[in-house]
Regions:
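Active-site/binding-pocket entry motifs
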Residues: 4-7, 52, 152-153
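Active-site beta-strand termini and strand-to-loop segments that position acidic
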Residues: 2-3, 37, 138
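Outer-membrane beta-barrel domain signature, strongest for Gram-negative TonB-dependent receptors
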Residues: 76-189
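A beta-strand signature from Gram-negative outer-membrane beta-barrel systems
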Residues: 1-19
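Short polar/acidic secondary-structure junctions
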Residues: 6, 23-25, 139
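Periplasmic-side early beta-strands and strand-to-turn transitions of outer-membrane beta-barrels
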Residues: 13-19, 23, 27-30, 34-127
Length: 189
């Protein structure tokens, strides 16, 4: 969103918001907070949010076995595996306004320790993102000049979450795994 500034001769402006939610299915919970302080020429804003959930439950049993293929790991018959997630997002912005000129900088950070997908082969087991956005906007007699520069770094790790296994073909594990090895396609060697 665009930065907010106080009106002329208003002095300063401060506002904020806080929110939270809880959903029993999956024990999902989250919250958000935002705050802004501004004068006629400077605006400082922060926004942050967090969300997390365990696997959610279906309306009734839809599987015939609790086996996941991972030794020692099972799921209830009504639990939809690989639907858990956890995320945190933060953004801090500062803007300066003088006459017909605006300079704005925003830094953001996102952390997702895990996001599991029931319809995908692999899960995201770690994700980190940092971003920096710079913006200038100036109105001149000949027109408007707007310039932006940004940098974004993302690093993530994909692998199989606890509800998935590497091999799903014949002899791929479960209660009838050959040699007792849940991920063995054929044998221990």
């Amino acid at each position: 969103p665009a930065p907010v500034f106080a009106e002329p001769r208003q002095g300063s402006l401060a506002n904020g918001e806080i929110g939270a939610y809880y959903r029993s299915n999956g024990n999902a919970m989250g919250g958000n907070v935002s705050a802004t302080f501004a004068t006629e020429s400077i605006s400082i804003a922060y926004a942050g949010a967090t969300a997390e959930s365990d696997n959610y439950q279906a309306g009734r049993d839809f599987k015939t076995s609790p086996v996941t293929g991972r030794e020692g790991h099972s799921l209830p018959l009504d639990e939809v595996g690989s639907t858990a997630y956890k995320s945190r997002n933060h953004e801090l912005g500062i803007a300066f306004k003088g006459g017909a000129h605006l300079v704005e900088a925003k830094v953001g950070y996102q952390e997702i320790p895990y996001q599991l997908w029931p319809n995908q082969r692999m899960d995201m087991l770690d994700n980190g993102q940092q971003r920096l956005n710079l913006r200038y906007r100036g109105v001149f007699g000949w027109g408007t000049l707007e310039a932006r520069a940004w940098r974004e770094d993302v690093e993530h790790f994909m692998d199989f979450g606890a509800d998935k296994r590497f091999w799903y073909g014949p002899d791929s594990g479960g209660p009838a795994a050959p040699n007792g090895m849940p991920c063995a396609p054929a044998s221990a060697t």
